[in-house]
Amino acid sequence: MINKETIENVKAVQSSYDEAPYKSKTFYYTQPGRQQMVLKLLGFKTPDLENARVLEIGCSFGGNIIPFALENPKADIIGIDLSGVQIDEGNRIIEYLGLENIRLIHQNVLDFDDKLGKFDYIICHGVFSWVNEEVQRGILNVIKNHLTENGSAILSYNTYPGWKNLEVARDVMLFRDEMLKNRGEQINESNAVKYGRGAIEFLSQFSMLNEKIKTGITGITEKDDYYILHEYFEENNQPLYLYNFNKMLLEHGLIHVVDSDLMKTFPNISNEIEEKLTAECGNDNIAKEQYYDFLLDRQFRISIVTHEANKEKINISKDVRITDLKEIDIRGKYEKNKDGFYTIENNEIKDEEVSLILDILSENYPNTITIDELEKKVREKNKLETNNVYANAVYLMYGKLVEAYSRKLTVKKEEKIKLNPKYKKYLDYFITNPNPVIALASYEGTINYDTINPIMLSIMTLFDGTRTDEDIFNFLVEKEKAGEVVITFEEGSSKEEVIKNNIEICRNFIEINFLNK
């Protein structure tokens, strides 16, 4: 039986998201492919993606799962959300795209329909910290009872200690709104953020708070209004310490395995600190991660979760086994500076082997290459029997310097490239909707394109399998001459150069994101 307070709380949340919806994006670190890759790296095999059953709790308009549905037509995807407004619009988008393997349901997670069955991958992003404890436990019950034996789930949530700094910003915004209400001002969702921004801008400029807190407050002012409204003005915002979060999981027969952002579980810290933590925590990975959060002031986590019974099957360790590394696929594209060195995070790469790895990845891009294949290529080129390819690959993955996948991805090279019809419909949605409610996403959501150039998208739709790049160039030149297309260009360039450059960009986008598969 749902208690009365929770019913009222749920109604408030539903009303908030109906009245002030926000753009639904694709979050890379929540994707089933990311979950599978991370767990594969740790020696644990999750179900195949192609035929997976996927559930998203709090799916909004479906922007996080629609790309997965497009990529995996044999998969079965379901999203649930409290907001009927967002569910209805999301289903209209799905119908427009012609997708039959995904549906969105207007449903409270506390009333979850058991007939929906079991799921191989469950996503719950941007929900857990923003509901009360009864709903949190309801979410965990759904995961426990509806996750397949070797399945995995994603739960994201705000964390302490980092959020203690941000609570100052939340408190001052809520304080100002309450003060103005008491003076007779009409405060509602349409103006609450405006007044809140004023309060934190004042703090940012004049406060005696320490610089770290002031920096965090200043960062809030750069966020969109809808983000600030739901992040800082919701009735519920309950950050958690990781160890308390894991206690809740254990009560439901679940465990935190690692953070989907591996650097949060295996940070790059000094050997001295690592040795002290190992002496303190032993094999208790949760305790060690909690210390990392204290040391690094973490404010947000994306936990990969599975059944507690699976713990012994997973190598939860910074020391990844070579057998697990071999079949991970990676890709990346890198540029050298004027001195002939690769530059990563403003550091010149002078290590010969790392430079060779970046050479090979760049030559192979946008195709992926397994780390086993990479190691063999390095041996062939440097003529040495021993190398550090596996260690360097881990460094690149943990540092988010390569894209990593659980399956091989190969670009289909064609002179007359053909955009897959399902992706043409996807692009058409953004071309015909000046204010789309979902974000255009790259493959697996590594990038969300908030600013969309409809002309560029229209050029992409010209790759229909009947035209070469030159044919498209000639077509656009004629359209420009007829006044049907407007080409803007800077001084020193020509319309023809701009058109050719745009065609190349569009071809690369299609190939890099496998839109012609």
Predicted regions and their residues:
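Conserved SAM-binding loop of SAM-dependent methyltransferases across substrates and taxa
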Residues: 61-74
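Conserved SAM/SAH-binding beta-strand->alpha-helix loop
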Residues: 83
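Long, charge-rich, low-complexity alpha-helical segments
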Residues: 267-310, 343-517
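Conserved alpha-helix/loop element of class I SAM-dependent methyltransferases that forms part
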Residues: 19, 27-52
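A short acidic, Gly/Pro-enriched loop at the edge of an enzyme's catalytic core
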Residues: 114-121
